[in-house]
């Protein structure tokens, strides 16, 4: 039996994966957790063989940081990132952290179980492209890389000056790209851009709570 830990803070997705795996005869679920740092501590004392990890979860670290720590601690553990986040940069970071496979929460039961089974057999499964979402009148896959980089930082609450410094481009360039984003999407201002992008799960919002989860569910 393969011991599986689910790390997911959204109840509906957590229970969906629990139900799906409980129907399979060769997977044994240990109690799920909603915080990535709790998952790391749990795996220190439990012989977990597979972790289904969300990226944006509760606790003092996100799913990508937890993946790197788990792989350092137990190189043979299999970790599948199962996420609704569509940020290409985030998925690249997850892969670099050591994730064995990455898949999306809205996948069919058959597709998700196929990824899980193949990962346990030693394969690495990664989506070819992030699904496109509509931001106003525009599809996210029509944005340039620089537009995506700037929009990501707008979602994370940075000012134009801060974006300029972080991306090492001029403030005028930042404003020009924001103007293009507003024209493409038909949205009235950068606040509307941030709200639409956040609602579409286009980027991870880098806002951590002050304290990790205390209880294991």
Where would I find each of the regions flagged by the language model?
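Short amphipathic alpha-helix used as the core "switch/output" element in two-component signaling
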Residues: 64-76
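Basic, Lys/Arg-enriched C-terminal extension of HTH/homeodomain DNA-binding domains
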Residues: 182-217
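Acidic catalytic/metal-coordinating carboxylates
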Residues: 35, 61-65
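Short, flexible helix-to-coil linker/hinge segments that flank and couple to helix-turn-helix
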Residues: 91-95, 99-145, 202-203
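Recognition helix of helix-turn-helix DNA-binding domains
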Residues: 159-192
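Active-site residues of response regulator receiver
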Residues: 54-56, 83
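Acidic, metal-coordinating helix/loop segments flanking the phosphotransfer/catalytic sites
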Residues: 32-50
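Conserved acidic carboxylate
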Residues: 8-10
